Amino acid sequence: RVAVTCFATNVARVATVAKVAEATGRRLALVGRSLHRLYEVSKDNGYLQSFPDVVPEDSIGRLPREEVLMLVTGTQGEPRAALSKLSRNEHQHVTLNAGDTVVYSSREIPGNETDINRVRNHLAGLGVEVLAEAVTA
């Protein structure tokens, strides 16, 4: 299973991830309330017109792992966001397991490093591969 985390308000990034899902033959799932709100508002206002059908969160677990691309909230390590819950195995509908991959598609905002690293450490403890931009000094 692949999960991509980004800011829910980045409509262009959400659209790009949807195109990646289509191009790779994966079904797109939105995980996190703010992503669902963005999706509805964007559709209602004429954005995301060519967006693929979205897999409901409670159906993700019934699909083969290699057929799903999840777009999840929590790129900055917010404790109540979907990615944080996934990293702690506390999400209501979805789990991440060894061999899964999480892609951080947004840069760290200074001051959030501790929260972000906490989530990344939890993911590593689950055996999840984390892909993020390298930080250099």
Region locations from a protein language model:
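Acidic/His-rich, metal-assisted hydrolase cores and their charged scaffolds
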Residues: R1-A137
